[in-house]
């Protein structure tokens, strides 16, 4: 399932935070369109916000560059450094740039969530196992301009601990 698009069955086998985010985004999105950043209320995430990254998709013709706009506090702690504002190639170890870039491009091009798992891609942090889902966001409902990444750390009970908030009972945006 590495670097793969996800089915409902896949989500059932993964950390519950990934399914929570899938369900939240499905609830807030306009009918038949992708959700955009404007539909996302970070207050609804509760403690899950500490595990969330937002990445800007800078389009250059057929090419993309990815810049970390927001990095959750747990992600910063796990990485052992701050990567907010950095482009992908400056944010992670060189041996992970292609893999993470492929995942991001797949989420952008397919307009579907993408899952991957690998060691933490930061200096001296490869002892931390990570898994993540890249969720596409599109301000216009169609062209992906941002990725919302949810991170989990399956091998570290303390770092991975999160109490998922209840799903809002109504659509916060119409």
Model regions: which residues?
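Intrinsically disordered, low-complexity terminal regulatory regions
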Residues: 1-91, 98, 102-174
């Amino acid at each position: 399932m590495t670097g793969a698009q996800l089915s409902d069955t896949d989500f059932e086998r993964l950390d519950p935070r990934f399914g929570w985010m899938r369900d939240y985004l499905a609830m807030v999105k306009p009918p038949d369109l992708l959700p955009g950043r404007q539909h996302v209320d970070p207050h609804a995430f509760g403690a899950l916000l500490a595990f969330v990254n937002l990445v800007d998709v800078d389009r250059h013709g057929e090419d993309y560059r990815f810049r970390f706009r927001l990095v959750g506090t747990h992600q910063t702690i796990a990485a052992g450094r701050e990567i907010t504002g950095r482009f992908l190639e400056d944010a992670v170890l060189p041996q992970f740039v292609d893999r993470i870039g492929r995942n991001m491009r797949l989420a952008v091009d397919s307009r579907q969530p993408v899952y991957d798992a690998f060691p933490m891609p930061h200096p001296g942090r490869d002892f931390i196992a990570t898994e993540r889902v890249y969720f596409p966001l599109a301000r216009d409902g169609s062209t992906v301009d941002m990725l919302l990444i949810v991170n989990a750390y399956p091998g570290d009970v303390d770092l991975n601990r999160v109490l998922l908030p209840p799903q809002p009972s109504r659509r916060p945006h119409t």
